[in-house]
Regions:
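N-terminal active-site beta-alpha-beta segment that forms phosphate/nucleotide-binding
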Residues: 1-100, 104-108
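Conserved phosphate- and dinucleotide-binding cores of soluble alpha/beta proteins
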Residues: 81-175
Length: 175
């Protein structure tokens, strides 16, 4: 299965799950994440503002925004620009209908980067939506622990890869 076919297959599988089921699964996946040694020890974590077909992170962001330095991606042109989340951060709908923070670029270090994806395999390969935003961003941060989070139906036997694809160090799902 090539990347386009895999994206279509995952989209079909997602339709078999109710919004309520995905929200409940998201809570359980994020509970696994917050009990993970890498998350517990991390002071600065890059997360993401979820789209409807991703592990739902909005409540998780609110829960942790005062406990850790939380960084969120914004999309500017072809690049991810990281922004630190603060108690005063305002949000606006950005490209792809993603709720993005409106603040200055974060230029510090990261302890952990949490990455969404359309599909992952158990050895850390991932495909996103096909624009390469995360791969371009992650290639500048190869020394940082990268954890992909996904629903079980997004975890497949093998993800087709290309030379510029950046692997996750680990993938967290319910299974």
């Amino acid at each position: 299965m090539d990347k386009k076919e895999l994206r279509s297959h995952i989209k079909t599988l997602k339709k078999q799950h109710s919004k309520e089921s995905l929200l409940e699964q998201s809570k359980l996946i994020l509970n696994k994440l917050e009990n993970h040694k890498s998350f517990i020890e991390a002071k600065t974590v890059m997360l993401y503002s979820s789209l409807p077909d991703e592990v739902f992170t909005h409540d998780f962001l609110e829960k942790w925004r005062n406990e850790k330095k939380i960084i969120l991606p914004t999309v500017v042109g072809d690049d991810i620009i990281p922004v630190e989340l603060s108690k005063d951060t305002e949000f606006a709908i950005g490209d792809f209908n993603i709720l993005e923070p409106q603040d200055n670029e974060y230029t510090g270090d990261y302890d952990l980067i949490i990455v969404p994806g359309v599909a992952f395999d158990r050895i850390g390969n991932r495909i996103g939506r096909g624009k390469g935003y995360y791969d371009r961003f992650l290639c500048k941060h190869l020394d940082v622990n990268r954890i992909g989070i996904c629903f079980d139906f997004q975890l497949v036997d093998e993800v087709p890869t290309e030379d510029n694809d950046i692997k996750m160090n680990e993938v967290i799902s319910l299974s």
